A protein has these predicted regions:
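Bacterial N-terminal signal peptides
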Residues: 1-9
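N-terminal leader/targeting segments and the immediate start of mature chains
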Residues: 10-57, 71, 213-224
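Short, solvent-exposed helix-to-loop capping segments enriched in aromatics
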Residues: 35, 112-129
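Extended beta-sheet lipid-handling architectures
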Residues: 43-45, 59-61, 74, 86, ...
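Short beta-strands and strand-coil junctions in structured, solvent-facing domains, enriched
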Residues: 51-53, 73, 80-83, 93, ...
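An acidic-aromatic
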Residues: 63-115, 184-191
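Gly/Pro-enriched, hydrophobic low-complexity segments
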Residues: 102, 121, 127-130, 135-223
Length: 224
């Protein structure tokens, strides 16, 4: 029993030392270096939504394409086909099952959308510090990658009324997020984005960010 306690104590000490090796300044500095040459990202994506009151977990999978010039496309493949397209201040959600596309003008909500989906992809540390209180949670292995986990607490009351904190798993090789977990306010609910087989700076043509749904599509502009 004594030897087991000593072993556990040793593991805790090693974990504490591993965390101590990374400072917030050091991590954000490495993320800044990665952001300097960030142009594009492609990855398989897993989106998980947990609803606490009914203990329900739903999962969507697909692909994401991001370009630094404010363009993003998410193609959901399972369980139901869906396309989310963002170009600048315009956001489109296309549902082929009902042949309908919802159109949103992001306007003042633009920065909030960027923080939800694009957080950590080419984001400068000054912008992260401006918007969040940052702390280091520790190191974890995820997808056979060594990652450091950051916890971000929004400074904005408006955002904190929706999201109380965000955890980001940062790949220590690429210094890009492998996973982001968003904890919703007052409910115990969370949603998570998991990026698999991520490739940085592959060429993504303009065609990937065009509205390529049928001309017969029904267009709807929901109220903000």
């Amino acid at each position: 029993m004594l030897s087991l306690c000593c072993s556990l104590s040793g593991l805790r000490t090693l974990a504490a030392q591993a965390t101590a090796n990374w400072t917030i300044e050091g991590i954000l500095g490495m993320m800044d270096k990665s952001a300097q040459d960030f142009r594009t990202l492609t990855a398989d994506i897993e989106h998980i939504k947990y609803t606490a009151v009914v203990k329900d977990t739903s999962t969507e999978t697909g692909h994401i394409f991001v370009r630094r010039d404010e363009k993003m496309r998410i193609e959901i493949a399972k369980p139901d086909l869906r396309t989310i397209l963002r170009t600048g201040d315009s956001l489109f959600v296309y549902n082929p099952k009902i042949n309908r596309v919802e159109e949103f003008d992001l306007g003042k909500n633009r920065s909030m959308v960027d923080q939800y989906v694009l957080l950590g992809f080419g984001t400068k540390s000054d912008n992260i510090r401006k918007s969040y209180l940052v702390s280091v949670v520790g190191e974890e292995e995820l997808d056979h990658k060594k990652t450091v986990v950051l916890e971000l607490t929004p400074k904005s009351d408006q955002i904190r009324n929706q999201i109380i904190k965000i955890q980001m798993w940062i790949d220590e090789a690429s210094w890009l997020p492998v996973q982001q977990k968003f904890f919703e306010a007052g409910s115990g609910d969370y949603f998570l984005f998991h990026y698999i087989n991520a490739m940085k700076n592959l060429k993504i043509g303009d065609g990937k960010f065009k509205q390529d749904w049928p001309k017969s599509v029904s267009r709807v502009k929901p109220h903000a």
